[in-house]
Amino acid sequence: MAIKFNQTKGEAQKNKIDSYQYVEGDNKVRMVGDMLPRYVYWLKGENGKNLPFECLSFDRDAEAFTNVEKDWVREYHPELKCGWSYAIQCIHDGKVKVLNLKKKLLEQIMVAAEDLGDPTDPETGWDVYFKRVKTGPMAYNVEYQLQALKCKPRALTEDEQALIAELKSMDEVLTRPTPDAQKELLDRLREGASNEPDETVTDEFDIK
């Protein structure tokens, strides 16, 4: 279908989900849907931008390093180590966003869930209140403190229910690449290291 000139965006529109941005001090989110277990490597891309490459040695379903699939990042960069990178979706500011979890924060949420129940349940779940606190001068000197006394069961509102009516699984939001696709991407990054930035490479890391 053709559209009017003043309606065009001039380029293909991407249907992707924003990521939640942690802020200093108080944070509040409502976790929804399923959780994605994964480990990632971080590689320098164009313009020095860090890009996440999923560790294919790690099995999402088993939550274990099974080494079933070929891990091309380990082959190309044996000095690199992968890091914990679990994620889930959340409702924040009237939108569904991807919440890239912090390990210590998730551990606190899991302890609280023993008493409060599943935080993702639409009817009996609860809002996650926590603080982000600087503990030193370096970027990594940060602590996440769950405010358990503020976390109370609350059913989702009608508007929130509408937001998650067609919620995707995290396996769709952050798709797992095949070993061949990952190798191709690594090769493209190598070849493009001395060339102009290739937007198609960066596009591979967009959240769907």
Regions inferred by a protein language model and the residue ranges of each:
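OB-fold ssDNA-binding interfaces and closely related basic DNA-contact patches used
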Residues: 1-119, 172, 176, 180-184, ...
